[in-house]
Amino acid sequence: MSEQPPFVHLHLHSQYSLLDGAIRIGDLVKKAKEYAMPAVAVTDHGNMFGAMEFYLKCQGSGVKPIIGAEVYVAPGSRFSKEANSASGEGSAFHLILLCENNVGYKNLSRLVSTGYKEGFYYKPRIDKEVLAAHSEGLICLSACLKGEVAWLCGRNRVEEAVATARWFSELFPERYYIELQENTLPEQTVANERLLEVARELSLPLVATNDCHYLNKADAHAHEILLCIQTGKTMNDENRMRFSADEFYMKSPQEMAAAFHYAPEALANTVRIAERCNLEFDFKTYHFPRFEPPPGESLDEMLERQAHEGLSERLVTIRAKYPDLTPEQEKGYFDRLRIELDCIKQMGFPGYFLIVADFINWAKDHGIPVGPGRGSAAGSLVAYAIRITDLDPLPYNLLFERFLNPERISMPDIDVDFCQDRREEVIHYVTEKYGRDKVCQIITFGTMAARGVIRDVGRALDMAYGDVDRIAKLVPEVLGISLEEALKQEPKMNELAAGDPRVKELLDTALCLEGLARHASTHAAGVVVAPDVLEEFCPVYKDQKSGSLTTQYSMKYVEKIGLVKFDFLGLKNLTVIDNAVKLVRAGKLPEFDITRLRDDDEESYKLLQAGNTTGVFQLESSGMKELLTKLKPSCFEDIIAVCALYRPGPLGSGMVDDFIERKHGRKKVVYDLPQLEPILKDTYGVIVYQEQVMQIARTLAGYSLGGADLLRRAMGKKDPAEMAKQRDIFLEGAKKNSIDTKKAEGIFDLMAKFAEYGFNKSHSAAYALVAYQTAYLKAHHPVEFLAALLTEDMGNTDKVIKNIADCREMGIEVLPPDINASDKSFRVLGNSIRFGFGAIKNVGESAILAILEARQEGPFKDIYEFCERVDLR
C-alpha cells in the first residue's frame, strides 16, 4: 500500500460563502477525516460566518481546524466606490489569509469587519493600508486567478506581478506563498507558468490549492444551479456566471498529488502551513461588559446593597397584599435572598444582574413599559428585589435553581419584554452606555427550506412557474419538514419525478442544496455587549440596507466564545396595557396602578371562565377559549397552569382532561405518598411543571435543588445512560428516607413521563400575570382596554374588525370616523369608542397630521372648507 501524499486543503468555501460555496461544515470534517488529512481550512468569501461552527465541529475529530478567509482587496482605497478597470470585476482582488495564532485571529476578525463597515462596494473590501496594519499572525496565499499576482500574470504583466508579490512577501515575511491551482482552465495554465517565474525570481515558496466550492465532483451541476440562484439567472442564459470546469471539489490527496506532480514542494508546504496554524480558543472565560460600580464599592457589594434595599421596599407592597404575613415568613424572604446572593457571587455573576437591572430601570424611568418577567429568571428573588422582574416568586414556589444552578456553571439568561414601539430606545441606551464599538445585534441565517429550495431551483432551471408551484405545494405543511421526509410522505412527488426527467432534475438538485445558508439577517432579540471592541472576540457584519451591525457568529457560537448576550423582546400587549392604564387614569381613576392588583378579583375570573378573552394576552385563541370554559380558572394558580398546559404535548397526552376532571371533583385526587401533596396540591395531583419534578426529587430522595435541576435536564434529554445513573441516585435517596422501593420506582417513572411535557413554571407565572392584568382591564375598564387594543391593532384590518365585534358583544358602541372628532388613535367617549384615522386604509401619517393641525383652528364646516384649510399634498 503506497504512502499517502502530504496534502491539506487550504482554500475552501463552505456554505457560508453564501450562494457560492456548497460545502456543509459537518460534511467537510467527515470528508477530511475520510481522507486522513491532519487539518483543513475554511476560507469563505470576505467573512468568517462559519469559523466557530467549523472550529467546534473539528474538536475530537482528529482534524485540525484552520480558520481563514478569502478577503477582497480594493485596488485603491477601500473608501473609493468607483470601479477600477485594473481588477477583474472592477472592484476587488482576492487574497487568502489563514490564522496562525490568536493574534492572527484578532487581526483577521478586524479585517473582515472593516470590509463590511468601511469598504463595502458590491463586496466587503479591505485595502493594502488596513492589511498592513493587521498582518501579524496571518499566513497569506496569493489566491486564485482573481488574486492580484495571478491576475497580472494572466495578462503577461510579470514585472508588475513580481513587484506586487515582493510587497506582500515583505508584509508577510516567511508567511507569504504563491498559490497554484490545477483546474483544466487554459487561463490557469498560462497564469501558473508565470506564477512559477515570480516565485523563482523572489525565492518564494509555492502552495497547491483547489479552491473547493463543493464536496464531490458529482455536485458540480447543483453548484452551477446555486450560482444561478445567487445571480438571478437561469441555466439557459449563456452569459450567466459559471465555473468553466467541474474540478472545484474537495479532491483527495492522491488526486492533488497527480495534478501537481511537477511541484511536490507545493503539496508539502500545505502540511507545513497546517503545522504552523495553532489557533486555540478559551471557551471557559466569560467576557462581561464593564459595569462601573460607585467609587469604593465592588460589584458584589453593590448587588448586595441594592438587593437588600430593594427587598425592603418590596416587602411594603407584600405586607399590604398579605396582611397576615408573619415575621417568620418575612425572615424566609431574607433567608432566600441570602442563598441567592451567595450563589450569584460564587458563580461570578453580580455584574450581569446589575447590567440587566440598569437598563430595565432606565426603561421604567423613561416610561417604557417592561414585562413582569420571562423565562426562568422570574424564579429569582434577587431579580424581583432589584426590579428586573415584578413577580414575587415565593407565593408560587418558583425555584431559583431552575434559573441558576450552582452545580452546573452556565451563564444566566434573562430575557426581557419591552413595549414593542420603544424597544429600540433601550437598545440605543445600552449602545451609548457601553460604546458603539462594543454593542451589536446577532446574526442569523436563512436557509433553503423544502418548499423554498424547490422554487429556487425551479426558477434557475427556467421551468414554468405553475409546474414548480404545484410541486412545491405537494410538500406537506409540517413545520421544519425536510425534502427527504416530504418525498416519503407524498408519493405524488416521486411519481412526477419518475415520469418527467425535468422534475427529477429539480428534486435531485433541491435535495442537494436543501438546508444551505441562503442569506444573512438579524436575530429578532439578541444583543451582544462586549468589554472591549467587539472585533477582539468576534468579527462584525454590516447589513448594507439597514446599516445595522451584527456579529458574524450566530447565537450559539457567540455564547460559546463567552460573549454576554441579552434578549430585548418586543411585546405589543405591554403597549396595550400601558395605553389602557393611561386612559383609565385620564378618566375615572387618576391613581390607578396595574402593578398593585390583588390576584383574586372575582370579575376577572368570571370573564376568563366565560372565555371572553379576545385581546387577553396568551388566552385569546379559539382553542384556549374552549380550554378556559372547560377548566373555569378560579385562582391565579389556575391561570399559571392554563399557560403551561395549552401545548401540543399535554393536550395530546390526556393530562389536560385529567387536570380538569380532578379540579371539578369528577375524579379523585390521589397522592402516592403524603409528601407529594404540598408539591402537587395546586395542580390537583398532576405533575405540570419542571419545578415540581425538582421538588419531588428534593423531598423524596434528598437531592439538592441544583442536583434536582440536573435530574430534570436528564429527563428532558432522555439520555439512557444519564437516566440510569439518576434512577440509581433517586432510589438510593428514597431508600434513605424510608420510602418503599416499588413506590419510589413508580414515582420516578411518573416523573420521567411528565418531564417530557413539564413546563417552566417561572415563565408560566410571569406570563400569567400579564394575562391576568389584561383580563382585569377588560373586566373592569373594557372601553379603555378595547380602545387601546384597537389602536395597537390599527394596521391590521382583520384584527380591527374582530375587536369591533368584541366591542359590540360587550355593549360598547364604536362610533364611525368623524373629520371633526376623530384622532389618529381610537378615543374613549364615555361608554363609546370613536374610530381612529390611523385605522382607515390609505390614509397616511402625513395626511392625518395635516388634518389634526388644520383642525386646531376650529372644526371644518363643509368639504370645501376642509379642502381649503388642509394641505392636500
Predicted features by range, described:
Residues 88-90, 131-134, 519-521:
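Solvent-exposed alpha-helices and their adjacent loops that cap or buttress functional pockets
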Residues 69, 140-143, 816:
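Non-cysteine beta-strand/loop elements that form the S-adenosyl-L-methionine
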Residues 2-42, 46-61, 110, 114-219, ...:
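Domain-core and long-helix interface of multi-subunit machines
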Residues 99, 112, 142-144, 180-182, ...:
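Short, structured patches in soluble enzyme cores that scaffold and shape functional sites
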Residues 80, 89-96, 102-115, 623, ...:
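Covalent nucleotidyltransferase
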